[in-house]
């Protein structure tokens, strides 16, 4: 079957790889000159299935009000003037109760665990290199309340069979030796030994090269104008004067998926702006061994070979990609506070990206009401964590095979009742 994939981020390229391996003739289209040059370029570097959790959580509405008055708040909201943003935020608020949180986190962990397993198989089969490490993740708590709240997430981990260690502050250095210098600032941590790390951009670009060698065609520097449809079928992708045709089409445009599907399929995917710093390592014994997640500031600090990646924060501000100095100051503050000798912060590269988020935190994966239009988008801050699993799942569904995990609740159909986002018309040209 001929398949066109829209988007060459980690999700689009992983989709291309798995569909190619299933025997399909695959073409990838992207406006950028190469793979992984937007949201997949400089994310936090964590592959953390156990920490897969929605931003929509109990207590978040009250915290959001408090964060409005804090300099280093992990979440910020600025109205963009669209009804779509308001409806999206309302649906997110409706997911902030305990029952929705547990349901959403449960399916996110399910997909993320499966994705890590798929990555392991891919790594074993191809020996793909991406500065990957398998040292686990350590979530750090600064208050006793955070330490006590960890029991809620532990229940989900136990249900999913995810190994963990709940550590007091005196034991944090057993996992991350450099934290011995700052343990007095912390109340403890939750360690997930099976989590991994790696450079998402390096992985995506190397996988794209492997996919191209295997027969996948990449059309870079090719802005997409619109999808062409007739009845319940998509019959082409209009790119300037050219129409690219296939038997099936996969939407993996990330945050731009919603606008590109305008008038065809409504999906509740909204950009969640995040930031990162990439820092050269200064002192080896002062740098992280693997990756940590600061629960207070929602910031991850991840070790690559000779670099430290510091990433996090969430801004609900539309498609704004301005690099804001206060956000850089927050990232610098956290990494200096936890790893004061770790990196040359003054030499850091500052970056921002738009993570495609659904109100419940779970991606939309599967077929739409159009027989040949498929979705693999809306992974939020977990695109790197979920890419291989959601792409293997998509390949299985499109190929008529039975997937290895339950998948019905990943479909966009879960939004068919009670939430139909208005189409963001002024964003229509965002990808073209």
Swiss-Prot record:
Gene Ontology biological-process annotations: D-alanine catabolic process
UniProt-listed SUPFAM superfamilies: FAD-linked reductases, C-terminal domain, FAD/NAD(P)-binding domain
Intrachain disulfide bonds: none
Pathway: Amino-acid degradation; D-alanine degradation; NH(3) and pyruvate from D-alanine: step 1/1
EC number assigned by the record: 1.4.99.-
Superkingdom, natural source: Bacteria
GO cellular component: cytoplasm; plasma membrane
Alphabetical list of Pfam families matching this protein: DAO (PF01266)
Reaction it catalyzes: a D-alpha-amino acid + A + H2O = a 2-oxocarboxylate + AH2 + NH4(+)
Ligand binding (FAD): 3-17
Record-linked InterPro entries: DadA, FAD-dep_OxRdtase, FAD/NAD-bd_sf
Keyword terms of this UniProt record: FAD, Flavoprotein, Oxidoreductase
Required co-factors: FAD
GO molecular function: D-amino-acid dehydrogenase activity
Signal peptide: none
Family, per entry: Belongs to the DadA oxidoreductase family.
Primary role: Oxidative deamination of D-amino acids.
Protein name per the record: D-amino acid dehydrogenase
UniProt source species: Escherichia coli O127:H6 (strain E2348/69 / EPEC)
């Amino acid at each position: 079957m001929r398949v066109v994939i829209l988007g060459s981020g980690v999700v689009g390229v992983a989709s291309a790889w798995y569909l190619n391996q299933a025997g399909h003739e695959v073409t990838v289209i992207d406006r950028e000159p190469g793979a992984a040059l937007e949201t997949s370029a400089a994310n936090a570097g964590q592959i953390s299935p156990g920490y897969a959790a929605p931003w929509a959580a109990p207590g978040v509405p009250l915290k959001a009000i408090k964060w409005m008055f804090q300099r280093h708040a992990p979440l910020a909201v600025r109205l963009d003037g669209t009804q779509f943003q308001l409806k999206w935020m309302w649906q997110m608020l409706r997911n902030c109760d305990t029952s929705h949180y547990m349901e959403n986190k449960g399916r996110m962990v399910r997909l993320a665990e499966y994705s890590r397993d798929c990555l392991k198989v891919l790594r074993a089969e191809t020996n793909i290199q991406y500065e990957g490490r398998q040292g686990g993740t350590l979530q750090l708590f600064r208050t006793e309340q955070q330490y006590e709240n960890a029991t809620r997430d532990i229940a989900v981990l136990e249900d999913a069979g995810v190994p963990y260690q709940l550590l007091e502050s005196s034991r944090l250095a057993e996992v991350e030796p450099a934290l011995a210098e700052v343990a007095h600032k912390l109340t403890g941590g939750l360690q997930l030994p099976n989590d991994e790390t790696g450079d998402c951009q390096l992985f995506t670009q190397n996988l794209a090269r492997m996919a191209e060698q295997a027969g996948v065609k990449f059309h870079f520097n090719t802005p997409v104008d619109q999808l062409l449809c007739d009845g319940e079928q998509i019959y082409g992708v209009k790119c300037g004067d050219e129409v690219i045709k296939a038997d099936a089409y996969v939407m993996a445009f990330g945050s731009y998926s919603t606008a590109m599907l305008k008038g065809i399929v409504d999906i509740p995917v909204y950009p969640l702006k995040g930031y990162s710093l990439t820092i050269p390592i200064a002192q080896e014994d002062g740098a992280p061994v693997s990756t940590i997640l600061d629960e207070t500031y929602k910031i991850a600090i991840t070790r690559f070979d000779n670099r430290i990646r510091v990433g996090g924060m969430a801004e609900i501000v539309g498609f704004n990609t301005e690099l804001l100095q206060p956000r850089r100051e927050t990232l610098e503050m956290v990494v200096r506070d936890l790893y004061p000798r770790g990196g040359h912060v003054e030499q850091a590269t500052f970056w921002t990206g738009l993570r495609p988020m659904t109100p419940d935190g779970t991606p939309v994966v599967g077929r739409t009401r159009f027989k040949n239009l498929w979705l693999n988008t809306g992974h939020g801050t977990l695109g790197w964590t979920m890419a291989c699993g959601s792409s293997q799942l998509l390949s299985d569904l499109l190929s008529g095979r039975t997937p290895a995990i339950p998948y019905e609740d990943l479909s966009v159909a879960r939004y068919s009742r009670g939430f139909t986002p208005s189409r963001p018309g002024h964003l229509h040209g965002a990808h073209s």
